[in-house]
């Protein structure tokens, strides 16, 4: 039997989780590790922001980086994080809750795009 408000057997809310890819980087393994890597070879890297949502709440996890940082760091910006979020129906101007996992440039670079968010 499920809880009538949550739909889950445990009574906990159910959320959808989306990974939104906004940038990429072509690189070698040695570019990712201090001191290099003796097994050097291609090791591309993708960059994501995340959305965790249900009918009552939307949380954005990390805010990514923008065009200026992408150019300075040699990353390929596929779309801004805000554009990626808009593609799944999330308006950054309306997001109230943002979770920052840590303070690296690729996790917190466009925080100003979330004017009413609580971090």
Name each model feature, range by range.
Residues 1-3, 31-34, 42, 100-103:
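Short amphipathic alpha-helical surface micro-motifs
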Residues 2-11:
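C-terminal regulatory/interaction regions
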Residues 13-16:
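Extreme N-terminal starter segment of soluble prokaryotic enzymes
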Residues 22-87:
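Conserved beta-strand hairpin/beta-sheet module of binuclear metal-dependent hydrolase folds
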